[in-house]
């Protein structure tokens, strides 16, 4: 099923290794409609890359929407109180955990507040005080109060807010497709992913998606 209000999206037929496939083309293809997938497509669109598709086995599936715990924690820069914090300090904390490269830790810390307030603006009910400070608490190995939570359904609220934003932008969503193979182009060090093949669950048909990224 293709979710797109403005127009029908029709495939072209292409032949790959002697097999004909219906083919959809776009600049950027995002696989998955959890919080990360919805956010990737939504952010790309907001930054000017509007030729983007979302591909998923099912919009209502996925860990972000369907999992819970006693307290799901969202980690961000400290945004309340009189304690000090900085991008560099948060990046160092992430790096010191031993499972993240330093450059990735720095980017995650630098984008932390921006990404958090995007979710706030989309209606995710993170707790705040009457002065507008988004209060936090300490988690394991955290020297600051960077953690926050909406309770056991935090990631569900995040996914729902991001889904609403994607739907408002009318980004095409191909739902009911299972990815089975990546399609590559080039050889050796020049080899790169050029698309993928997915199974349409409704028909059992193999469908090719061609993308620049």
Regions found by a protein language model. Give the residues of each.
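Conserved N-terminal/central alpha/beta ligand/cofactor-binding core
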Residues: 2-11, 15-23, 57-202
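Core beta-strand elements of the Rossmann-like FAD/NAD(P) dinucleotide-binding domain
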Residues: 21-26, 202-212
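Short glycine/serine/threonine-rich phosphate/pyrophosphate-binding segments
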Residues: 37-40, 64, 207
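Long alpha-helical scaffolds
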Residues: 44, 178-179, 210
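Short, hydrophobic/aliphatic alpha-helical segments
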Residues: 48-59, 210-212
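Residue-level recognition of conserved structural "scaffold" positions that shape functional pockets
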Residues: 39-41, 69, 76, 211
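N-terminal Rossmann-like FAD-binding beta1-loop-alpha1 element of flavoenzymes
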Residues: 26-54
């Amino acid at each position: 099923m293709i979710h797109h209000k403005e127009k029908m999206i029709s495939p072209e037929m292409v032949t790959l290794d002697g097999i004909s496939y219906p083919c959809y083309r776009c600049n950027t293809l995002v696989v998955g409609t959890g919080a990360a997938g919805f956010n990737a497509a939504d952010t790309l669109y907001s930054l000017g890359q509007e030729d983007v598709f979302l591909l998923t086995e099912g919009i209502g599936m996925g860990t972000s929407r369907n999992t819970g715990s006693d307290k799901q924690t969202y980690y961000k820069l400290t945004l309340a109180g009189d304690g000090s914090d900085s991008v560099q300090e948060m990046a160092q904390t992430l790096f010191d955990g031993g499972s993240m490269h330093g450059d990735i830790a720095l980017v995650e810390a630098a984008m932390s507040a921006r990404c958090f307030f995007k979710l706030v603006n989309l209606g995710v009910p993170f707790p705040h005080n009457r002065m507008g400070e988004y209060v936090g608490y300490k988690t394991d190995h955290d020297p600051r109060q960077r953690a926050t939570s909406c309770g056991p359904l935090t990631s569900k609220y995040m996914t729902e807010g991001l889904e609403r934003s994607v739907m408002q932008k009318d980004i095409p969503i191909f739902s009911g497709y299972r990815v089975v193979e990546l399609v590559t182009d080039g050889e050796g060090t020049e080899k790169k992913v050029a698309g993928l093949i997915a199974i349409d669950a409704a028909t059992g048909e193999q469908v090719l998606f061609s993308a620049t990224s």
